[in-house]
Amino acid sequence: MKQYAIQPATLEFNAEGTPVSRDFDDVYFSNDNGLEETRYVFLGGNRLAERFPVHSHPLFIVAESGFGTGLNFLTLWQAFDSFRSAHPQATLQRLHFISFEKFPLTRDDLALAHQHWPELAPWAEQLQAQWPLPLPGCHRLLLDRGRVTLDLWFGDINELTDQLDATLNQTVDAWFLDGFAPAKNPDMWTPNLFNAMARLARPGATLATFTSAGFVRRGLQEAGFTMQKRKGFGRKREMLCGVMEQHLMPTLSAPWFYRSGSEKRETAIIGGGIASALLSLALLRRGWQVTLYCADDQPAQGASGNRQGALYPLLSKHDAAINRFFPTAFTFARRLYDALPVSFDHDWCGVTQLGWDEKSQQKIAQMLSLALPAELASALNAEEAEQAVGVTTRCGGITYPAGGWLCPEQLTRAVIALATEQGLQTRFRHTLTSLVAQESRWQLRFMSGETASHETVVLANGHQINRFDQTRPLPVYAVGGQVSHIPTTPALSALRQVLCYDGYLTPQNPHNQQHCIGASYHRGDESTVWREEDQRQNRQRLLDCFPDAKWATEVDVSGNSARCGVRCATRDHLPMVGNVPDYHATLTHYADLADNKTSAAPAPVYPGLFMLGALGSRGLCSAPLCAEILAAQMSNEPIPLDASTLAALNPNRLWVRKLLKGKAVK
C-alpha cells in the first residue's frame, strides 16, 4: 500500500544564521542579504512593480519551483500589500501563489528561519499558523481573508507538474525558477520542468531565475520562452529572465474529465446546507453575484441540521483516490473552520476509531499502513485508547488527534449569515421544480409558479439533486438516518473524544449536556419520520461493540429525542463536484471511446450548470474543499487538486470508467 507521508527537510543553521540543507549541501537563501536578493531577482526580474498597476485581471498568479523557507512568497506578499495600499482602486485585487516543495520544512524550522527577517514577521506568522502537515499533493492556504491564496504542492516537482489538471494550462503570469543550485540539485533542472513551465505560462508571462547556467537558458528557450541575461545580484555576474511570447496549444490528456468554467460572474445556488453556504462564501470572495434558493424556510433543515457531527478523514484499505482526497480535505477543513469569523459549538477533542472485532481490526491495520503523519492519524493499543477517550473500551484502534465534533446546524446558519453580510441574496421557501436552458442563461421554475433567470446555476441540494431532467441519470442514492440525542451522566461525561465503532458517540456538548449517538442507515429511504426501532438500534450497536463496558449501559434513548435526515451518497464514497454531465450526449459521443481515446473531444456537459453533491456521511470533512474546488473551476482559477483525484470527483466518472473499458452503461 502506498505511503502517504512526505519526508521533511533536514537542515542546520550556519554561523550567519542561514539555514543549510543537509541533503543538498546548499543554503536556502544568500548569506549576504537573502531578502534583497529575492526582491532583485524574482520581483525585479519579473517586473512586478510595474506590472501590478496595469494588470487587467483581478487575480495575479505566480508559480515557483522550491518553496524552501517561503522567503520569496513572503517578500512578494509584503510587496503586494504595499501595492494594494497605494492602489486601492486597481483592477488587481488578489494574489495566487503556487509553489512546489519536495522536502518541506517542519513548522519549528520554518519559524527559526523566519527569525532572520523581522520585517516580514506579520506575514510569516500567518504562514506559520496555517503550515500544513507533510502530506503529498496540494495544500491550499487562504491568507489575509482570502485576498492571498497559497497552493503548496508537496512532492517532486517533475512528478507533480505531470499530475496537474489541464485547467491550469496557460494561467501563470510569472514564474520564480528557484531551488538549490543546478550543480547541487540537477534532478530538478530538467527539460520536463522547463516544458511544464511553458505549458502553464499564459502568453506574455515572465520568468526569472538566479542562475545563468547555459543549459537552463537553452532548455527554457527550447520550451518556448524568449530568454535574456540580466546583471546578477551582488557578487553574481548574471541571472536569467524570460518571456513567453508564443501561443502554445497544450493537448488534453484526458478530455473526458475536462472541466469548464464560466466567463460570467453571476450564479444561483440551489440548496440550504453546509455545501451551499461554503460555496457562497468561496464565490463571493472571487467577486461573484450569488443568489441562494432554498426550499425550506431557513437554512440547515436537511442533512446539515444535526446538533453534533464528527470531523475526521475517511480512509480506505483499497481506494487510493479516497486516501488522496480525504486527508487533504480534512486538513483544509480544519484550517477553514478555524479561520471563519463566526461562532459555532465545536470541540477539536480528537476522534478515535476502535477495532471492536477481527474485521474492524484488519481494516484499521490497513489504514495505519498508509504511514500518515502522526499529527493526522496514529495507532493506539487498548490501554492508550482508553487513556485517550476516557472510558473503558478494551480494544485499540486509530486516533485522529486534530479531529473532533462541531454543530453543523449552527455552522451552516452562521456561514450563510456571514455570506449575506458580504452580498449573498437569499430566497427561502423556493422549491425548484425544473431547469430550462434559454440561450446563454438558465430559467428556474419553482413550485410556486415563480421563475427566475441566471447565467449559471449550481445544484447543491443534497439527496434531491437528481430530481431534474438534467440530473436524473446521475448514479447517486439517498440514505436515511436517525441520530439520537441522549442526556449525559457522570459515567458518560468522562468521554473525552468522539468514539467511532459500528456507530459513533460524541462527548457531551457542554451547552446542552447532551450527546449524539447514531446513526441508522436506510439506503434508498428518504423518510424523515422518527422510528422507535432506530432509536433502540443506535443504543444496541454501542452495547454490542463494547459488551463489558458498564458506562455504555447508561445510554438512555427513552426520551425519544432524535433527528432524522437524508444524505446523498455514491457507491464509491466520493463526492460529485463539477459540471453537470449530459448523460445521453456522453453515451453517444463516447460510444467508441475504448477504441478512440486519442481523438476524443471534451466531455459533454450542460453549459453553465454545475453541481456539488453526494457528500455522504463526511460532508463536514469534504464540503470545504469541494466548495473551494468548484468555486475555482467556475472562476477559471487554479484548482487545488491533482488531475487523477479530480477525475475521481467528476460527476461523469462512473459512466466514463465503463466507456473507457468498452462496457455498457446501465
UniProtKB/Swiss-Prot annotation:
It catalyses: 5-aminomethyl-2-thiouridine(34) in tRNA + S-adenosyl-L-methionine = 5-methylaminomethyl-2-thiouridine(34) in tRNA + S-adenosyl-L-homocysteine + H(+). One of its GO terms (biological process) is tRNA wobble uridine modification. Residues 270-666 are annotated as: FAD-dependent cmnm(5)s(2)U34 oxidoreductase. SUPFAM superfamilies: FAD/NAD(P)-binding domain. Its EC number is 2.1.1.61, 1.5.-.-. Pfam families: DAO, Methyltransf_30. It is found in: Cytoplasm. Its cofactor is FAD. One of its GO terms (cellular component) is cytoplasm. It comes from the Bacteria. Its main location: cytoplasm. GO terms for molecular function: flavin adenine dinucleotide binding; oxidoreductase activity, acting on the CH-NH group of donors; tRNA (5-methylaminomethyl-2-thiouridylate)(34)-methyltransferase activity. In the N-terminal section; belongs to the methyltransferase superfamily. tRNA (mnm(5)s(2)U34)-methyltransferase family. In the C-terminal section; belongs to the DAO family. Catalyzes the last two steps in the biosynthesis of 5-methylaminomethyl-2-thiouridine (mnm(5)s(2)U) at the wobble position (U34) in tRNA. Catalyzes the FAD-dependent demodification of cmnm(5)s(2)U34 to nm(5)s(2)U34, followed by the transfer of a methyl group from S-adenosyl-L-methionine to nm(5)s(2)U34, to form mnm(5)s(2)U34. This is tRNA 5-methylaminomethyl-2-thiouridine biosynthesis bifunctional protein MnmC. The gene is mnmC.
